[in-house]
Amino acid sequence: MPSSPLRVAVVCSSNQNRSMEAHNILSKRGFSVRSFGTGTHVKLPGPAPDKPNVYDFKTTYDQMYNDLLRKDKELYTQNGILHMLDRNKRIKPRPERFQNCTDLFDLILTCEERVYDQVVEDLNSREQETCQPVHVVNVDIQDNHEEATLGAFLICELCQCIQHTEDMENEIDELLQEFEEKSGRAFLHTVCFY
């Protein structure tokens, strides 16, 4: 088992649903975890598919909650958005953009391939300073409440297994292969350096 706790980041597009559900579950299990989005703005479903609610990453979850409560309490209660924002504001004040974070992680989990590509591109564009490896793993999770919950438990199980490896660098590929077979999902994996 590693001598220090695994430093984990979970990343989706808007730091609202998938990454926050995983953040919630991982932090309850005692992991050192942060969550992020990679988008230029935070997008939440609106009254129609072509009318999302768009916010800046500086907007707090509380401000978003109150804005949607004012706009249409019934709609945003019924579709679960207010419940999700209520959970989010109990975890941290506002969404965060991955590209603005300078913290180092051992493991970064992304929730869709486009986000994985953005994270890898960002890490590769940074100046390498410590040559410390960071494993970036993509677990495809559909962006709805049910899939976010299932995906978060899968991410948690994966983190627990990685936390208990003797040698993460040499065991992670085999571990991911086992998880692929067990879950029926394909994982993307690469190593970047800080």
From Swiss-Prot:
Say which enzyme class the record assigns: hydrolase
Q: Which domain of life is it from?
A: Eukaryota
Any idea which GO molecular function terms this record carries? RNA polymerase II CTD heptapeptide repeat phosphatase activity
InterPro entries recorded = RNA_pol_II_suA (IPR006811)
Which Pfam family, just one, is annotated for this protein? Ssu72
GO terms of biological process kind: co-transcriptional mRNA 3'-end processing, cleavage and polyadenylation pathway
The record's catalysed reaction(s) read:
O-phospho-L-seryl-[protein] + H2O = L-seryl-[protein] + phosphate; O-phospho-L-threonyl-[protein] + H2O = L-threonyl-[protein] + phosphate
Q: Which UniProt keywords apply?
A: Coiled coil, Cytoplasm, Hydrolase, mRNA processing, Nucleus, Protein phosphatase
The EC code for this enzyme is 3.1.3.16
Coiled-coil zones:
160-187
Q: Where in the cell is it found?
A: Nucleus; Cytoplasm
Q: In which tissues is it expressed?
A: Highly expressed in the brain. Expressed at low level in most tissues.
- Tell me where it mainly resides: nucleus
Cellular component annotations (GO), alphabetically ordered: cytosol; nucleoplasm
Query: What is the role of this chain?
Result: Protein phosphatase that catalyzes the dephosphorylation of the C-terminal domain of RNA polymerase II. Plays a role in RNA processing and termination. Plays a role in pre-mRNA polyadenylation via its interaction with SYMPK.
Q: Which family does it belong to?
A: Belongs to the SSU72 phosphatase family.
Q: How does it assemble?
A: Interacts with GTF2B (via C-terminus); this interaction is inhibited by SYMPK. Interacts with RB1. Interacts with CD226. Interacts with SYMPK.
- Name this protein carries in UniProt: RNA polymerase II subunit A C-terminal domain phosphatase SSU72
Tell me the organism's taxonomic lineage.
Eukaryota, Metazoa, Chordata, Craniata, Vertebrata
